[in-house]
Amino acid sequence: MAHTDFSTGLQSASEIEITVTGRRSGRSLSYPVWFALDGDKLYLLPVRGSDTEWYKNLRKTPTIRLAARGKTFTTSARLLTDEEQVGEVVEKFRDKYGAGQVKAYYPKPDVAVEVPLA
């Protein structure tokens, strides 16, 4: 699917579905997640940080499929571990969802994921 079609599906979405490949099973595994957009990049924060299962799966196989409002897009994820970069992603989430929500749902923001949409 074209990037512009998928981006249109993101405009009014507060949550998307990601699909990753299981590191042990090799099966496709899907999860609902919050996201933040910045230009042609989409950012994800794993709820339990680096202990989150879907994040561990991306470490082995960085291919990720995103789905929003009936539109899908498949690309490679970039894992962010630099404290400053992760902090910038946390700020994007605070701007979108509110500081209280981010604090409640993301107690261990030690990693983030960058997904190029172009």
Predicted regions and their residues:
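Short, solvent-exposed coil/turn segments
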Residues: 11-13, 28, 59, 108
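Generic signal for short, ordered secondary-structure residues
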Residues: 4-5, 37, 68, 72
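Short beta-strand segments
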Residues: 13-47, 64
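Extreme N-terminal tail/first-helix region
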Residues: 1-17, 84
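Short, structured beta-strand-loop surface elements
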Residues: 49-118
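Covalent nucleotidyltransferase core used to form phosphodiester bonds in nucleic acids
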Residues: 6-8, 43-56
